[in-house]
Structures are given as structure tokens and as C-alpha cells.
A protein has these predicted regions:
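Intrinsically disordered, low-complexity mixed-charge segments
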Residues: 113-146
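N-terminal presequence-like segments and adjacent domain-start helices
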Residues: 1-7
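C-terminal structural segments of small proteins and small subunits
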Residues: 95-108, 115
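Short hydrophobic/aromatic beta-strand micro-patches
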Residues: 43-46, 95
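N-terminal first-folded block
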Residues: 8-40, 47
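Short linear motifs in low-complexity or flexible loops
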Residues: 148, 157-163
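Compact, glycine-rich, soluble single-domain proteins
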Residues: 51-69, 84
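Glycine/charge-rich, flexible interdomain linkers and switch-proximal surface loops
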Residues: 25-36, 70-89
Length: 166
């Protein structure tokens, strides 16, 4: 299964809008094989909360103007650390670097193909997805967390908090 032409078009608009506002490490992934509710993820990094908000506003404005669509749902805008825009066929994740590294959507969806977007250079996915070989895990949904000997056995996004942070 591959993403629809409409989803690829909308994802491209979102990715270019994010690039216009200096979003970094912009990834567009075809998640049709893993997500029944969306065709593409657009994952973007912003340096700080203000930049995240600016990127989100630009994505919304460009998709409204060029595709006539508005998000069905918008989550996280108040905090500005990880904003999710759900457009149905695409879901945009605009995150601060710390959230992106910790939650690791790039790792969780490592097996999903990248969708090329003209004018947007996507990051080397290995740098975001290192440490997890999904092909060795098989179906990630079949992993039994109760069988793990330690947290390192689980396909989590990043290191857990230090003892003094708990």
C-alpha cells in the first residue's frame, strides 16, 4: 500500500512550509503500512517553543491556502514542545529537538519509506533511527513488554530519565 496522491501533495506543502520557517530535519514518511488512519507523517524539528509555533502556523496557513484543508485536530499547541496537526490523510508532528529524540517517531517508523519532497532535503534517517533494527523485531505490535529484562530491551525512543529526575 502506498500513500495517496492527495496525501503526498499535502505532505509536500506542509514540508515546504516548515522549511520556509526554518524547520530542521524535515522527514516525510509513507506510513500506510503501519497507520490505518493516515497515509503520511511529516516530522519537523523546531529549536524552541516560539519556532515550533511559527512552523505550525505556517503549515496551517499554507495547507489552507494551497489545498483548502484545515486540521481535524490540533494538540500540544499551548506547550509548544510537540504539536500534532491531524489532517486525516497526513499527520504533522512539529517537535523540539529534545522531544523528537526522546519520543523517537523516526525510530518507531523506521521501516516506513521516505517520501521525496522537491525543495526539502530530508535528514539521513540512520541518525534518527539508530539503535533499533525493526527487521529483527518483526511485528513491533507483538512485542511483550512483560518479557523484557530491562528497559533497554524495549524499542523505546531514547534514554530514560536519570535517577535524580524521577
Amino acid at each position: 500500500v502506498t500513500a495517496s496522491a492527495e496525501a503526498i501533495n499535502h505532505a509536500g506543502i506542509a514540508a515546504r512550509a516548515a522549511a520556509e520557517k526554518l524547520g530542521e530535519d524535515i522527514s516525510v514518511l509513507d506510513v500506510t503500512g503501519r497507520m490505518p488512519l493516515a497515509d503520511c507523517f511529516v516530522i519537523v524539528t523546531g529549536d524552541n517553543e516560539r519556532m515550533v509555533a511559527s512552523i505550525v502556523d505556517e503549515i496551517e496557513a499554507e495547507l489552507a491556502e494551497k489545498a483548502g484543508v484545515k486540521p481535524r485536530m490540533r494538540e500540544g499547541h499551548r506547550d509548544g514542545r510537540w504539536v500534532l496537526l491531524d489532517y486525516g490523510t497526513i499527520i504533522c508532528h512539529v517537535q523540539r529537538r529534545e522531544e523528537r529524540e526522546f519520543y523517537g517517531l523516526d525510530r518507531l517508523y523506521r521501516d516506513c519509506p521516505a517520501v521525496p519532497v522537491e525543495g526539502v532535503e530530508q535528514p539521513d534517517r540512520g541518525s534518527w533511527a539508530e539503535g533499533l533494527d525493526v527487521t529483527e523485531l518483526g511485528d513491533i505490535d507483538r512485542l511483550d513488554p512483560l518479557q523484557a529484562q530491562s528497559i533497554e530491551d524495549l524499542p523505546l525512543a531514547g534514554p530514560g530519565p536519570d535517577a535524580d529526575e524521577i
